[in-house]
UniProtKB/Swiss-Prot annotation:
It is found in: Cell membrane; Endosome membrane; Cell projection, Dendritic spine; Postsynaptic density membrane. The modification Phosphoserine is found at residue 307. Keywords: Cell membrane, Cell projection, Endosome, Hydrolase, Lipoprotein, Membrane, Palmitate, Phosphoprotein, Postsynaptic cell membrane, Synapse. Transmembrane segments: none annotated. This is Alpha/beta hydrolase domain-containing protein 17A. InterPro entries: AB_hydrolase_fold (IPR029058), Hydrolase_4 (IPR022742). GO terms for biological process: negative regulation of NLRP3 inflammasome complex assembly; negative regulation of protein localization to microtubule; positive regulation of protein localization to endosome; protein localization to membrane; regulation of postsynapse organization. Pfam families: Hydrolase_4.
Amino acid sequence: MNGLSVSELCCLFCCPPCPGRIAAKLAFLPPDPTYSLVPEPEPGPGGAGAAPSGPLRTSAATPGRWKIHLTERADFQYGQRELDTIEVFVTKSARANRIACMYVRCVPGARYTVLFSHGNAVDLGQMCSFYVGLGTRIGCNIFSYDYSGYGISSGRPSEKNLYADIDAAWQALRTRYGISPDSIILYGQSIGTVPTVDLASRYECAAVVLHSPLTSGMRVAFPDTKKTYCFDAFPNIEKVSKITSPVLIIHGTEDEVIDFSHGLALYERCPKAVEPLWVEGAGHNDIELYSQYLERLRRFISQELPSQRA
């Protein structure tokens, strides 16, 4: 679809959809969970274990220590040593959903922790191999979470829940691990750029990375859309100018899901944008396979952040 026809315009303005419906139709494809959380026994009276029994999937979160159990579909690429670096727990959002969180200690004493908001149609189980590899290669620890309705997180996916979910993750990272905002890099991929831009527009942090970002839901569905309507969803284009931290935008020139023009438009609207990474020939899901991806991330983190230039 390359633009708005007369009938589509009539439909939009006579019966405009609510942002939630646009969001649901465009964005959310939660996979079947590829993991569960298994309680670790804790010392109790007389040495007895005091952890709850049974795996945690969508049941109420309980205090205690948990380990992640991955299914074959998670396709974990590492061994037990790397798996032992992954901490998992469940927190609660302001919208009363239980949000699964993952902290990957890739580098002891790392200067930065990346708060990673993943793309669509994946969950923490499928992403944890990538997190181990990414954190090790860029010298950062990785913190991530599953959106409402993804993985073992409860609730249903929605735009409002996305914003509440990342707020819960941000607070958990800061309070549970004592990570200060100037040590947090917000990283959003695809649909994950939506909560990332929203949070970054409200809080200052060390830096922001937008990987294959979208400008808004309407602009994805109707590429000729030039303005943001009141019923639009995911209005990154209206929020990106409010970000006060350095922003690196990464986009493939042959992106078949979110057109390259979205990355260009956000770059032009973002006063804190640094030199972007436009990956020639890359699509929506293969940017990480190009050597310049890691090279640009390393240079951004090691040379271009204010704390590194001081």
